[in-house]
UniProtKB/Swiss-Prot annotation:
ATP binds at G153, G154, A155, G156, V157, G158, K159, T160. It is an enzyme of class 7 (translocase). Produces ATP from ADP in the presence of a proton gradient across the membrane. The catalytic sites are hosted primarily by the beta subunits. The keyword rRNA-binding does not apply. Belongs to the ATPase alpha/beta chains family. It comes from Clostridium perfringens (strain 13 / Type A). Its EC number is 7.1.2.2. The keyword NAD does not apply. InterPro entries: AAA+_ATPase, ATP-synt_VA_C, ATP_synth_F1_bsu, ATPase_a/bsu_AS, ATPase_alpha/beta_chains, ATPase_F1/V1/A1_a/bsu_N, ATPase_F1/V1/A1_a/bsu_N_sf, ATPase_F1/V1/A1_a/bsu_nucl-bd. Transmembrane segments: none annotated. This is ATP synthase subunit beta. F-type ATPases have 2 components, CF(1) - the catalytic core - and CF(0) - the membrane proton channel. CF(1) has five subunits: alpha(3), beta(3), gamma(1), delta(1), epsilon(1). CF(0) has three main subunits: a(1), b(2) and c(9-12). The alpha and beta chains form an alternating ring which encloses part of the gamma chain. CF(1) is attached to CF(0) by a central stalk formed by the gamma and epsilon chains, while a peripheral stalk is formed by the delta and b chains. It is a peripheral membrane protein. Keywords: ATP synthesis, ATP-binding, Cell membrane, CF(1), Hydrogen ion transport, Ion transport, Membrane, Nucleotide-binding, Translocase, Transport.
Length: 465
């Protein structure tokens, strides 16, 4: 802690101006500690130098009770958070303070949340598929180990449930470490996630970091960096880490609030002019090195379902795979409501996933595309007016569409159906058999919410009795 002490001269909501001596202005991103009247320490981060002796800071917590003239101490370093084994099984805020009822974390090892991205020499990305056990993802938009994946969808189509299922599958099937970062989302969901993880036993392999929607914009803007910093430590120790960010849109949204509070002129649709720079600084740190990997899954809220909005559009540039959740699919009762035609992946390539996988995925997409084209004709004339070949395509497409649904472990209490983890070999075999026409006589409804193709046949036998 340095001896550089200033005084608060202005407070406008979460923006705090602090006056220091001319030659002792704190650096940009330094943490400033202000002792409140009730004894609590308010942490602010330096964002701008205003004039010769004033710094403009953003508070990481509420500023109620703060007044002018209070002393502010420059810590001489950015906000630092605990890293290492001590963070597993715990919940933290943006400052690395525990939010659960556990003991204080007195860890010697701390990392600053502002760190440079790994250099080109350190980076390593060998294209390799990451099995999730979710059929529609593994078959049509497979995830890359050490890649960045975007989960796109409007409000209420199932982004958070899909993330929870991924955490569950990764912990149980791969034994990997996960860092979950809740950025500007509902506290209730964080609470539910914590208790579900406690029940399923995956909490011991997970660190949770939250900056929820009731917190000041500074906390929501920086909490993604806190979670990333914890994940970077595990990566540098040679681990394969999963970093979940729910929701990356709130990172952009908080940045736009902070930008407006700092008086910057807004850019397109009211976003901050530095949107691409801020997103790039975060995303470039989420990468795999020669030591270990960070595979990141980022939920992306799409405002008004408009994919051309600057916030989701800026996120697109950084992704290796995108999983698009569709309201029209959710409306017909198929969950996960992943759009098989809009979702894509860079590694759906025969050199990475193999010839058989690539061929089956291509044929599935082709049939679904043809079915989409035929739907207009069906709506006007009915199925009976189609050619026999097209009737067969429609019948198989409907079976494929229903077979892309799957019961989730984390949704068991709502659906009453036991969750299923489906290995990629079983997924490919199931769809290959449907494409070959082996199950043309099986009723369509048997394919809905089944795991493997054997389960479909069991359901069909039960229905026939």
């Amino acid at each position: 802690m340095s001896n550089n002490i200033g005084k608060v001269v202005q407070v406008i909501g979460p923006v705090v101006d602090i006056k220091f001596a001319n030659d002792e202005l704190p650096n940009i991103f330094n943490a400033i500690h202000i002792k409140m009247d009730d004894g609590k320490i308010l942490v602010c981060e330096v964002e701008q130098h205003v004039g010769d002796d004033i710094v403009r800071t953003i508070a990481m917590e509420a500023t109620e009770g703060l007044r002018r003239g209070v002393e502010a101490v420059d810590t001489g370093a950015p906000i630092s958070v605990p890293v290492g084994e001590c963070v597993l099984g715990r919940i933290f805020n943006v400052l690395g303070k525990p939010l659960d009822s556990g003991a204080e974390v007195n860890n010697e090892e701390k990392y600053p949340i502002h760190r440079p991205a790994p250099s080109f020499e350190e980076q390593s990305v060998v294209p390799q598929m990451f099995e999730t056990g979710i059929k529609v993802i593994d078959l049509l938009a497979p995830y890359q180990r050490g890649g960045k994946i975007g989960l796109f969808g409007g409000a209420g189509v199932g982004k958070t449930v899909l993330i929870q299922e991924l955490i569950n599958n990764i912990a149980k099937e791969h034994g990997g470490l996960s860092v979950f970062t809740g950025v500007g989302e509902r506290s209730r969901e964080g609470n539910d996630l914590y208790y579900e993880m406690m029940e399923s036993g995956v909490i011991k392999n997970t660190a949770l970091v939250f900056g929820q929607m009731n917190e000041p914009p500074g906390a929501r803007m920086r909490v993604a960096l806190t979670g990333l910093t914890m994940a970077e430590y595990f990566r540098d120790q040679g681990q394969d880490v999963l970093l979940f960010i729910d929701n990356i849109f709130r990172f952009s949204q908080a940045g736009s609030e902070v930008s407006a509070l700092l008086g910057r002129i807004p850019s397109a649709v009211g976003y901050q002019p530095t949107l691409a720079t801020e997103m790039g600084a975060l995303q470039e740190r989420i990468t795999s090195t020669t030591h270990g990997s960070i595979t990141s899954v980022q939920a992306v809220y799409v405002p008004a379902d408009d994919l051309t909005d600057p916030a989701p559009a800026t996120t697109f540039n950084h992704l290796d795979a995108k999983t698009v959740l569709s309201r029209s699919i959710a409306e017909i009762g198929i969950y996960p409501a992943v759009d098989p035609l809009d979702s894509s992946s860079r590694i759906l390539d025969p050199r990475v996933v193999g010839e058989e996988h690539y061929e089956v995925a291509s044929k599935v997409k082709h049939i679904l595309e043809r079915y989409k084209e035929l739907q207009d004709i069906i709506a006007i004339l009915g199925v009976d007016e189609l050619a026999d070949e097209d009737k067969l395509i429609v019948a198989r497409a409907r079976r494929i569409q229903k077979f892309l649904s799957q019961p989730f472990t984390v949704a068991e209490q709502f659906t009453g159906m036991q969750g299923r983890y489906v290995p990629i070999k079983e997924t490919i075999r199931g769809f290959k058999e449907i494409l070959e026409g082996k199950h043309d006589n099986v009723p369509e409804s048997a394919f809905l919410f089944a795991g493997t193709i054997e389960e479909v046949l069991e359901k069909a036998r039960a229905m026939a009795q």
